[in-house]
Amino acid sequence: EINMMEFVEGVKAKETLGIAQILEGSYEGKKIRMNGAVHNVRDMGEVAFVILRKAEGLVQCVYEEGVTNFDIHDLKEESAVEVLGTVKAEERAPHGFEIRLEEIKVLSQPAEPMPIPISKWKMNTSLETKLALRPVSLRNVRERAKFKIQEGIVRGFRDYLFTQGFTEIHTPKIVARGAEG
C-alpha cells in the first residue's frame, strides 16, 4: 500500500535504528530492525556472533541455531544486511548491548572476498597497500579511528578559534599541497 504523502514528498520514514537511538532510548527487551554490513562472523557451533558495522561503530548480534530464521553459513563478511531482533543489555558487547537475532535479511553480497583483512584489528599490510585500497581499508575500525582522532583535534582548534573571534576562510590561494600552474 502506498502512502500518498511519501509519494508526494519523496520521503519515507526510517524503519531501522542506529546505535545512538538505542543508547538514548529505552529499547531493552524490545524488537528492533537495524541495517549494517557484516564485519565478522564468529561461529561457535549452536551460537554465533555476527558483528555488524555501522557508521557509529560495531554492534554485536547473537545468532542461535533454531531461533534465528537464517542459515549462518550463508552469511559472508561485507554483506549488507537488515536484522530483526531483541535488544539485551550485555556489558561485554560493544556499546553495552547486543541484539538477539530472530531474522537476517541479506540485502546484497560482495562479488568477491575483500583484498585486505579489514575485520582484523591490525591489518598487517603495507602503507602503500592501505593507500591504494583506501576506500576498503577505511572500513577497518583501527584505520577509521585515526581519522576520528584527527577530526576531533581539528574541531577543537576550530571551536577555540571561533570563540576567540577568528573567521574561518577557504581561499584557493592557500592550499594544503603545492599546486601546479
Q: What residues fall within each predicted segment?
A:
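Class II aminoacyl-tRNA synthetase catalytic cores and aaRS-like
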Residues: 1-181
